[in-house]
């Protein structure tokens, strides 16, 4: 709080990596510059995965932008208002600090950012931006492996040898 002062700030969760032509944070900063309020980075997830994320109830505004009406932390499939998930990227106004100071523990006995954002939404408009790019959940073992392979294959100095390694391993897999 003392470092940020009275400025909006970005929160990037370390278990989410986004590969995009225009960096995800740049996309969100552009949205912030237009709307001048908190922006949540979102993408659609499969309905069966809504219980892994903060899920939004939204009103579509334009193109990739939604106005947030409500949010639910890790709802059941039946209770999810949509399949639009908050995916580890936020630009938040400093008002959130006043809310966090008095925020009660939520799911898992922890202070949940989603709960604090719900309170913030009663004080100011919050928008969601459906960012472009491939998101990897590197907190998940398979997501970590997918990111490692995809990023290695993009590196010119690794690509040929790594591709040969993958082909060798794939040939060993019995079907």
Label every model-predicted segment.
Residues 1-58, 92-94, 100-103:
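Conserved beta-loop-beta/alpha segment of the NTase-like Rossmann-fold superfamily
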Residues 9-10, 29-33, 62-164:
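Catalytic-core segments of class I nucleotidyltransferases/pyrophosphorylases
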Residues 19, 26, 122, 143-147, ...:
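Alpha-helix boundary/capping detector
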Residues 160-175:
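Terminal low-complexity segments of carbohydrate-biosynthetic enzymes
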């Amino acid at each position: 709080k003392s470092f940020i002062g009275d400025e909006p700030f970005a929160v990037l969760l370390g278990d989410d990596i986004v590969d995009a032509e225009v960096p995800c944070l740049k996309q969100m900063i552009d949205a912030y510059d237009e709307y001048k309020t908190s922006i949540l980075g979102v993408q659609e997830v499969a309905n069966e995965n809504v219980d892994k994320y903060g899920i939004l109830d939204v009103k579509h505004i334009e193109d990739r932008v939604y106005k947030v009406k409500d949010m639910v932390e890790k709802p059941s499939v039946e209770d999810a208002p949509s399949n639009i998930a908050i995916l580890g990227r936020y630009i938040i106004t400093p008002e959130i600090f006043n809310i966090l100071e008095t925020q009660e523990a939520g799911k898992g006995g922890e202070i949940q950012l989603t709960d604090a954002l719900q309170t913030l939404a009663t004080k100011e408009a919050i928008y969601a931006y459906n960012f472009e790019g491939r998101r990897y959940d590197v907190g998940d073992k398979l997501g970590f492996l997918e990111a490692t392979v995809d990023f290695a294959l993009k590196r010119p100095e690794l690509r040929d040898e790594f591709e040969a390694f993958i082909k060798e391993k794939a040939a060993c897999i019995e079907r």
